[in-house]
């Protein structure tokens, strides 16, 4: 055990013209020092995407917080959410971040942009293991935490920001990393950092 604690903040941005966001975030405290955070992104936008992402995040966060394996979680999601008949892709993607005893971080990622970790002011390249569960390519990582580590999880709404307009090819992950590195030493809260990223996505 150590004296570290997690500061969590997030922002959601509705698709233009939609009343509901297609992304959903769930945060569940397993105990005083362990937290499960799930970001799910429903296919499309609006009401349908919101329902799908909410269902996905609720299922995963609840199952993981109860100690069930990621294999069980993914199999349940696969059985619950159908695959789009037109695109042939799952109706919802997800990113799971679990803080264990404020000492380790476990990441499970499916079809969202990979989590960005900033450590000592720079991007930290962490190892990941590829798994195939129910035909889905899942990436699993586990790292030791250090003080002032910053984890940035996002849906593809960030990397598609400005496509064909302000940014011809969207906002690339490496450009997001470079942008967020500039705020590392400022001491902003997680909520402020997520707001900065959110606002930059719509500029």
Report each predicted region and the residues it spans:
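Acidic loop->beta-strand submotif enriched in PP2C/PPM serine/threonine phosphatases
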Residues: 18-32, 125-163
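N-terminal glycine-rich anion-binding loops that anchor highly charged ligand groups
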Residues: 26-35, 45-51
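Active-site-proximal, acidic helix/loop segment immediately C-terminal to a metal-coordinating Asp/Glu
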Residues: 45-66, 151-197
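Regulatory cytosolic signal-relay segments
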Residues: 1-20
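Beta-strand-turn-beta hairpins that frame and shape the catalytic cleft
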Residues: 3-6, 31-34, 101-104, 146-149
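Catalytic core of PPM/PP2C metal-dependent serine/threonine phosphatase domains
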Residues: 52-121, 138-139, 186-203
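Residue-level marker for buried hydrophobic side chains located in beta-strands
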Residues: 38, 109, 151-153
